[in-house]
Amino acid sequence: MTNLLFAQPKQNWVDSTYQSLTLEQKIGQLFMPMVFSQGDQNHYQKAISAIEKYHLGGIIFSKGTIAEQVRLTNEFQNISSVPLLIAMDAEWGMAMRISDVSPFPFQMTLGAIQNDSLLYQLGQSMANRQRRVGVHLNFAPVVDVNTNSKNPVIGLR
């Protein structure tokens, strides 16, 4: 249940912020390019320029380390005129994209678990880890139907 005491001020902020945007800025809010947190300075500079020039709505992080992703998240949020939506494609946890975190089991393994409570706790743990590093949205779970046992992409995930 939404706490109505706090819902109205947030809604007012959203409405007033949206109304203050130009058409170009509103269009920019629709875009979320991918940024590699293990990229080089040139890669980061391009991301910063895109945030400033196109008024991006968010960033999708991929490949890197936690420290670098947190640093970039803070830097990008500081230069953006509207808070960015930070996302990852981390269907089996952040270890899918971040090198210095412990992995969770692959989806095929989780599908064999009969304990819904355990699966719920695992999902909570994944969400908590991502929240701690500033991720708002995980593009997961997904439905990958493995119709070819030799599929190198889907495999056990």
Annotate each language-model stretch with its function.
Residues 1-9:
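Bacterial Sec-dependent N-terminal signal peptides
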Residues 1, 21-23, 46-51:
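Short, flexible, solvent-exposed loop/turn segments with mixed acidic/basic and small polar residues
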Residues 10-38, 43:
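Mature N-terminal segment immediately following signal peptide/propeptide cleavage
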Residues 36-44, 48-157:
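Enzymes and membrane/adaptor proteins characterized by extended Gly/Ser/Thr/Asp/Glu-rich
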Residues 8-10, 16, 77, 103:
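Generic hydrophobic alpha-helical membrane-segment signal
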Residues 2-3, 21, 79, 107:
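Generic signature of intrinsically disordered, low-complexity segments enriched in small/polar residues
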